[in-house]
Amino acid sequence: MVQKKFCPRLLDYLVIVGARHPSSDSVAQTPELLRRYPLEDHPEFPLPPDVVFFCQPEGCLSVRQRRMSLRDDTSFVFTLTDKDTGVTRYGICVNFYRSFQKRMPKEKVEGGAGPRGKEGAHTSGASEEAATGSSESGSTLQPPSADSTPDINQSPWGKRRAKAGSRSRNSTLTSLCVLSHYPFFSTFRECLYTLKRLVDCCSERLLGKKLGIPRGVQRDTMWRIFTGSLLVEEKSSALLQDLREIEAWIYRLLRSPVPVSGQKRVDIEVLPQELQQALTFALPDPSRFTLVDFPLHLPLELLGVDACLQVLTCILLEHKVVLQSRDYNALSMSVMAFVAMIYPLEYMFPVIPLLPTCMASAEQLLLAPTPYIIGVPASFFLYKLDFKMPDDVWLVDLDSNRVIAPTNAEVLPILPEPESLELKKHLKQALASMSLNTQPILNLEKFHEGQEIPLLLGRPSNDLQSTPSTEFNPLIYGNDVDSVDVATRVAMVRFFNSANVLQGFQMHTRTLRLFPRPVVAFQAGSFLASRPRQTPFAEKLARTQAVEYFGEWILNPSNYAFQRIHNNTFDPALIGDKPKWYAHQLQPIHYRVYDGNSQLAEALSVPPERDSDSDPTEDSGSDSQDYDDSSSSYSSLGDFVSEMMKCDINGDTPNVDPLTHAALGDASEVEIDELQPQKEGEEPGPDSENSQENPPLRSSSSTTASSSPSTVVHSAHSEAADSTEMGDKATAGISKPLPPVPPSICKSTVDRRQTETGEGSVCQRTYDNPYFEPQYGFPPEEDEEEQGESYTPRFSQHVSGSRAQKLLRPNSLKLASDSDAESDSRASSPNSTVSNNSTEGFGGIMSFASSLYRNHSTSFSLSNLTLPTKGAREKTTPFPSLKVFGLNTLMEIVTEAGPGSGEGNRRALVDQKSSVIKHSPTVKREPSSPQGRSSNSSENQQFLKEVVHSVLDGQGVGWLNMKKVRRLLESEQLRVFVLSKLNRAVQSEDDARQDVIQDVEISRKVYKGMLDLLKCTVLSLEQSYAHAGLGGMASIFGLLEIAQTHYYSKEPDKRKRSPTENVNTPVGKDPGLAGRGDPKAMAQLRVPQLGPRAPSATGKGPKELDTRSLKEENFVASVELWNKHQEVKKQKALEKQRPEGIKPVFDLGETEEKKSQMSADSGVSLTSASQRTDQDSVIGVSPAVMIRSSSQDSEVSTVSNSSGETLGADSDLSSNAGDGPGGEGSAHLASSRATLSDSEIETNSATSAIFGKAHSLKPKEKPAGSPIRSSEDVSQRVYLYEGLLGRDKGSMWDQLEDAAMETFSLSKERSTLWDQMQFWEDAFLDAVMLEREGMGMDQGPQEMIDRYLSLGEHDRKRLEDDEDRLLATLLHNLISYMLLMKVNKNDIRKKVRRLMGKSHIGLVYSQQVNEVLDQLNSLNGRDLSIRSSGSRHMKKQTFVVHAGTDTNGDIFFMEVCDDCVVLRSNIGTVYERWWYEKLINMTYCPKTKVLCLWRRNGSETQLNKFYTKKCRELYYCVKDSMERAAARQQSIKPGPELGGEFPVQDMKTGEGGLLQVTLEGINLKFMHNQFLKLKKW
């Protein structure tokens, strides 16, 4: 599953293995390397010397000549895995017996072969491990028993030798082997059989010639020369000519071009067309299963379904498994099949399909402490007499179909039900389909028991699902072996994606970082708690490395077939791995290995002669008997092994002179004739595999061979890495230069947009707008039952079962209830732009998040669907690739769920984060009355908003409301909502630069109400933790920030102060404030606030550009309503500034509440600088920014659509600096954009030096920047966190006061939740995810990883530093919060260091966190200030643009970020993201108001035109952002300048000059002439 590095060679090596001097006196000899092609090693892959043992695992066997010779032609596969790099090479081996003459004393030693000595492989530079082998025939072997142990003193060898009598002919095992990076097992096997046939035919031709050589010797001569037993000089020139032509054939085969996945196939002619069809080599694209060129269902047939699933359970749960068999082929194929069947998981431990018996110390690998899967021949343990099998290894005997458990094995957990029953049914049905009966079997249980099988003419009547289209029935796709293999893999994927196994897996993963490699934390506790039924299997599976790695792999998967299966696509024509299903779509490359002028054609045309002494090396179509590894004449396996042990096989790695492998001729002498090119448009002849009738590929734009250019090459130039005999020497006989084959693999560019129906019909539409190419959509109801996968291009509404043809506009989304918002949205103008200072805090994000989490059990929001970038569409798959950037992740974490909570639709393994849109039933079908659910959620939020409003007015929660509040706060969604309204923290621009979060003074009545709400929230968090954190617990960061920053003062005069006296106190005037009003608030993740903001340093803020930030779909309407309500807001603001000294400080919150209620219809509330009068003298007012309003629970702001809520569902999607509580977990989502840049962090000094001030720690001192306040301040302030800790004050008055503020339903003591370390870990992981979302670090991980890999070292380091800073900031705040709640300091150290190691934080930031931990003993309570997160400092601008040159184009929203430009669709989903390094040029025309952007798209330049009224502002906004991005790269060496001066010379006059290339054009300067005379041609 790991993406393999491209290899420019189709074949690496072709070797011949056997005994150079076969002996009839021993049953086995040490195998030797007889011949290798090429002679030189490839630099990255030297030929492993151990390959000889893998080719002949039990040694080079010698047997007596037998008449039944054809049965001994066998083939098998083995693998070689590099221990350092993990790269796997495949060996395809054909073993056969060739006869040799028993030496007579008077006979000369053939040709002086003796001096050549023993032979072995070249020096091995690669650490190779493991291989597979297997014979094609399937002999059975009884399990080894005590009585089958080898008896060295007694064997049948002497008896057989006595019976031989006068016969002197014997046979020796010979191996032809191909080593390759590519698993083309069947086609490579055909190549080897063809090579063997060529040598055999040359031997047969000798029989008809009078060469003066005895007939028996003639038959052996060709092989003896070919294997190096005879010297060439001693034989006739005819033999030499034949062998040279055979070697030329081998060299041409080694030069074969390589197929490109999803693009090109290679058709190789190994023999003339009239003798054999061309062999097709093709690789599937990533949307299909990976190529498995062997019968995947083989273990199911050998072991049966039940035993096979038992072995799979052992493998999945990381037990040691050893398979054994006498059949090499069955052994190796079974091991590889088990590994392939666990897809999409990947086996993370050693896999050795065949471990040779005769290899020295091979048994030591079985002592490895890690899990493994190893296949061994049946003779392995009998041969290794002194080896004792470990007592924790499961032994699988394929010959006896038994699974033998180890002595101390733990009981394997049973697979969960009903998933296991469903899986068994599917597997049995797949196997049954290969029987002679072509109709589906009605009762699989009776079939399995061998009873009478009733057949059903149509579909099974007992369908498990109500929708016929979703019934899994692989039989409808054919009963051939390849279709059964696909059905088997589909069944396994569906099993893993079932509710009790891994469904919804990605909901419980938290991405900690992407660079330099992804690090993902898997929350196993919440995952297991979300299972409908708790099973031991799921519990153990969740703890395996395969599942842990799956969380990282799924961020950027190398294969997408599992996602298509989740969308109910099972057709092998769409997901199958065999070339017969897709080869016709690929561009053919024709390559000919066979030379038409070769005399081998004459040999091939000679009919083979057979006599009573027929040679066992002749080929035939099938084996007549089971292959028994040449030991069929032995009465038991023990007899055979005893003979092997007598032979004294040397199993050590050979080290021999490479000259002994010398070829007969040089590769440079190979003559290559050009293949006649096909006529243009001519369809190449189909090969035998593709000529059969297959189901047509249901594609709207499939590329066929006839429509693609047909590249015809005869041979490819070898790469520099190839051997000299293949590339270094000039070939004199080559008639034409060979066209080079590109060595680099291009990613698949299949551009299919398929709409699958039951009849295979194709629905295709044309789209003039390039921004809405067919990508995704929702099928109509009438097509639902037949729909296999949806490729509809638009977000379409379904009316009466037909597709809507009109694109959705912001005003075309119908709201949940009647309101003026809909009409206002329809009448609004889209040509306005909005700017956003995203300096708000956690609460803004939390309030934004809460709007997304309604109806979590129904269909997901359109705002979660993000259009893929154009580059992603071009390089990925033909099925919909909807990357759910950003918003959906928050939905997943905060969605309330619990054990047994029924979800409307099952979630896929990748759930809503999948890069594929959900299948039609998931998107369209909703439980009854969606309006009712939406209204209910809105009512709950409205109720809580009134409660919060009452608390901020000093009226408290209310006795009657307490019970309902506690019940509602059990939802993380509503916790986030309430905390976002409670937080009154304000952070000015000066505070942001100084990394300061100011304390907030509240009245005593407000304190009481807020404390009650916080305690209710803590109780709800206890419930969430009891359910393993389901729904998320990131809200604790927001809660503790409020608790640490909000206080009331006991002094009456302080209660009458204006809030600005506290909020805006300059740092340094109060000796007790260093960097913040309160030392603890500094580390808190800020939460947006409803209250006013402190004024910026300039008093105006960033208002130069009149660009405001788009926050939601109904943004257009909100801009109009802002103008409409501007005066009303101003009047209400003026009313609130009346001097009321005795009024509680934050009665000001009422103004904001009324403002937000007033703007509920529009969803956006604005505070403009134009409405500031003398209000500024009373309270601090922020610059003109969008204030996150609290109308998100309004009924009118809930969109009712088949897709759920859109981006504009709530007004809280708009961003602002101060609307709710600031907590770490939600600050980053303040701006609700779905594709923010990964580096949109303010790069000023305050941000980059976020740890600069607070960590200048000294022994026994408080951290710098967090000094203790004066005793007067501390003694007069009562913070909310003190109430959370219980009555810990000394005075009786304090205790009485606390008792009076407690309610009967709330605990007065410190919660035990604070002592649960797992709670803090889960909260940290949730907070990291939310912060990353807000900063755009997780939006489109595939694209961001690709971009990271394309950047220079400096930019890579910057991105890594951004992630380190984020993690270190949250860890710092975590320490602060744990100190605040009096957690044991030793536990703090252990947990934080564990999280720091899990996060892979860099050295600089980890050292800063360690400094805090080192000073932990001297810190208490609020001594450690909290830090503001990076998402507080993010800024971006959004512009409304039209595609094209006028307003007739579709509306898009262009966001200008720090390092990219994001283009959103009209409903807020991300369509494109253009990194600045990809932009080539940018111009604008003030007259036409058109902006032109040129960008690099692969090797092409693409022009995009946009019309916008703010054309000039957009141009300069992008220009400034690009300049800032370029400033970050000053340390990078500049690239090549466009243009320059080049010395030239006039060829006519010889005069020298300069050629100047500039952006304006080309200029020529000579000493005497400044102009050149141009002649007309």
UniProtKB/Swiss-Prot annotation:
Ranges of Low complexity composition bias in the record: 123-140, 699-715, 826-839, 928-938, 1189-1203
GO biological process terms held by the UniProt record: anterograde synaptic vesicle transport; execution phase of apoptosis; negative regulation of apoptotic signaling pathway; regulation of cell cycle
Record's subcellular location: Cell membrane; Cytoplasm; Cell projection, Axon
SMART domains tied to this protein: dDENN, DENN, uDENN
PROSITE patterns from the UniProt entry: DENN
Domain Death: 1336-1411
Entry-annotated residues carrying Phosphoserine: 155, 688, 691, 812, 817, 819, 857, 861, 915, 920, 929, 1058, 1109, 1237, 1266
List of residues that carry Phosphothreonine: T1060, T1065, T1235
CC per GO annotation: axon cytoplasm; membrane; plasma membrane
Disruption phenotype: Apparently normal in utero development but immediate death after birth, probably due acute respiratory failure. Absent GDP/GTP exchange activity of Rab3A. Apparently normal development of the central nervous system during embryonic stages. At 18.5 dpc, no evoked action potentials of the diaphragm and gastrocnemius muscles in response to electrical stimulation of the phrenic and sciatic nerves, respectively. In contrast, axonal conduction of the spinal cord and the phrenic nerve are not impaired.
GO molecular function, one term: guanyl-nucleotide exchange factor activity
Record's keyword annotation contains Protein biosynthesis: no
Biased composition (Polar residues): 141-156, 688-698, 793-803, 1157-1172, 1232-1248
Compositional bias annotation for Acidic residues: 614-629
Domain cDENN: 288-428
Region annotated Disordered, chain positions: 106-166, 604-635, 676-840, 912-940, 1050-1109, 1127-1272
Presence of keyword Cytoplasm: yes
Domain uDENN: 13-267
Alphabetized UniProt keyword annotations: Apoptosis, Cell membrane, Cell projection, Cytoplasm, Guanine-nucleotide releasing factor, Membrane, Phosphoprotein
Tissues where this protein is expressed: Expressed in the brain.
Subunit structure of this chain's protein: Interacts (via death domain) with TNFRSF1A (via death domain). Interacts with PIDD1. Interacts with YWHAZ. Interacts (via death domain) with KIF1B; links the motor KIF1B to Rab3-carrying vesicles in anterograde synaptic vesicle transport. Interacts with KIF1A. Interacts (via uDENN domain) with RAB3A, RAB3B, RAB3C and RAB3D; the GTP-bound form of the Rab proteins is preferred for interaction.
Similarity field: Belongs to the MADD family.
Function: Guanyl-nucleotide exchange factor that regulates small GTPases of the Rab family. Converts GDP-bound inactive form of RAB27A and RAB27B to the GTP-bound active forms. Converts GDP-bound inactive form of RAB3A, RAB3C and RAB3D to the GTP-bound active forms, GTPases involved in synaptic vesicle exocytosis and vesicle secretion. Plays a role in synaptic vesicle formation and in vesicle trafficking at the neuromuscular junction. Involved in up-regulating a post-docking step of synaptic exocytosis in central synapses.
Name of the featured protein: MAP kinase-activating death domain protein
Organism: Mus musculus
